[in-house]
Amino acid sequence: MATVQKIYEEMQRMAPLELAESWDNPGLLVDCGGEVSRVLVALDVTAETLAEAEQNGCQLIVTHHPVIFHPLKKLSPADLPFQLVQKGISAICMHTNLDAAEGGVNEVLAGIFGMKNWKPFAGGCGRVGEVEPITVPELARKARVELGARCNTPLDGPEVPVKYADTGKPVRRLAVISGAGGGLFEEALAMEADCLLTEIGRAHV
């Protein structure tokens, strides 16, 4: 049977920790050891995902965002790492190393949008490349459909889950970066991108 350590070693082969940004904290962050028969995969470790893992008999939670990000100065029963140990559930978190990895988050995004001849940017996390000419509104619609953004909201409804600014020019060269990429606008421009697609932008750029 698989163990926490064996699963972690396989994940490191796919997304080596050396690819992570210096400020990040990916890895096997809560190690309760032992064998693993069931795994819960989620974006974050939350009270809800922890409860779901426990209800489904999972010995391991794998997330994108680290459950321990800043150095711990104290630990209490209200803290999620404490609760994980208490319940005997380990946590592996793969963040910017998975963003930057070959076949990782941003290469998947590049594939979704049909990117060709891509190059890395944003320290290797993002991707910039050529796409078939598309308008910005069409690109926003494609993002909503392909990424399932608020899939229960009508695409032309009053609530717009994908925000965009439109220069009116077609997008032929696209930059993609998962997470908070609003600060990479100038770098995307320097790489001749017509559009930057990211999870979190900025109000003023």
Features from the language model and the residues they span:
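Hydrophobic structural segments
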Residues: 1-204
